[in-house]
């Protein structure tokens, strides 16, 4: 419950500035002024009074503090997330390497048998998946300076925020190593080192390619917004799991400068090739970023369309999806939800479907400036190669689509789910809305009888 209630006279109450003589006023419209929210409260003042110097200064601070506060919250969350991620990963590694037969005295170093490799890899992969899922709403759940650098390169993260997160990640790695060292008996066993006869150059490139795979996974599952983004942490965790299975024996499976730097600081032992655990992941992030920008330049969405379809019969317009992935639209803008395989594309404007068949030579792009066709709510039918159809987002066009003979109708089905239009009854091609277009159809809406307007 908010203790700072608004007052008459356009002012607001801050702690130690309460005026009991003023009556309370409505909270209407405060949600639109979230940038002026009183810190550490849920209340947004309608206006700000300048009658006293403390309130005037408070108003100025309210306008300036939000950006700083957001950076602070993200930095703190990234520190906490990195600490938790590496704490459980380091703990698992410590257990795997210490829980060895009594006659095995050399337990410090890289895991030497498949059981240890699997145990360590699972600890890293699962720890990343869980903690990334917890913290991705706050800071992004990156936990890795190389990943953060890659996100900055592709423009998914501001550089200033990236620097703050990298600092938090490095400190988090040190904190996690210190906590594990203090809680668990025995020497630190989770430092990264080369093993299996791996040379420094080999270790460098192993780290580079493993990091590139992890960073590119994050780009495609998290930076790219799609219907599966909410489960991206699972794929990211599995990506790290695979990387650890491959790299733990040869390099310790760092793929994260903070993961290698923290244990070295706590143990006070730096190998002469420690630099490969910085240079390798950074090169991997650059490689992944370059490839990601390359496929974005080629509009990869058009190569395999329909990957974000959520219903039977729904086909995603690949060109619209490519545009949607590059720019931000208003919340009500549903862009390019459907496209015939050989017909013209269409758009959503305020919930209505506008468009024209292919024969008219009109291939409308999302949010086109060209005028809408007449009676746009009554969707036009396709011609020889199929035109446009509707889906459940269209006003009064629920379930519309093409029949077997290409006729168009509005919200009319028989008991068996077939579609009726222009007095002809045809079989729905693919689900609700259909794809592939129609063989014959009419674009003259005057040919429809009253039955088809129900």
From Swiss-Prot:
Extracellular face residues: 93-115, 185-202, 251-274
Keyword Oxidoreductase on entry: no
Catalysed reactions, as listed in the record: H2O(in) = H2O(out)
Domain of life per record: Eukaryota
Kinase recorded as keyword: no
Localization: Membrane
Glycan attachment residues as annotated in the record: 103
Region called Disordered, residue ranges: 343-454
Cytoplasmic side: 1-71, 137-163, 224-229, 296-454
Positions occupied by motif NPA 1: 144-146
Keywords: Glycoprotein, Membrane, Repeat, Transmembrane, Transmembrane helix, Transport
Membrane topology: Multi-pass membrane protein
Induction notes from the record: Expression is higher in conidia than in vegetative hyphae.
Main location per the UniProt record: membrane
UniProt short sequence motif NPA 2, positions renumbered to this chain: 256-258
Annotated knockout phenotype: Leads to a slight reduction in the vegetative growth rate and delayed conidiation.
Transmembrane portions of the chain: 72-92, 116-136, 164-184, 203-223, 230-250, 275-295
GO cellular component labels: plasma membrane
GO MF assignments: water channel activity
Domain comment as written in the entry: Aquaporins contain two tandem repeats each containing three membrane-spanning domains and a pore-forming loop with the signature motif Asn-Pro-Ala (NPA).
Similarity remark: Belongs to the MIP/aquaporin (TC 1.A.8) family.
Described function: Water channel required to facilitate the transport of water across membranes. Involved in conidiation.
PANTHER family: AQUAPORIN TRANSPORTER, MIP17260P
The protein's name: Aquaporin-7
Biological source species: Botryotinia fuckeliana (strain B05.10) (Noble rot fungus)
Gene: AQP7
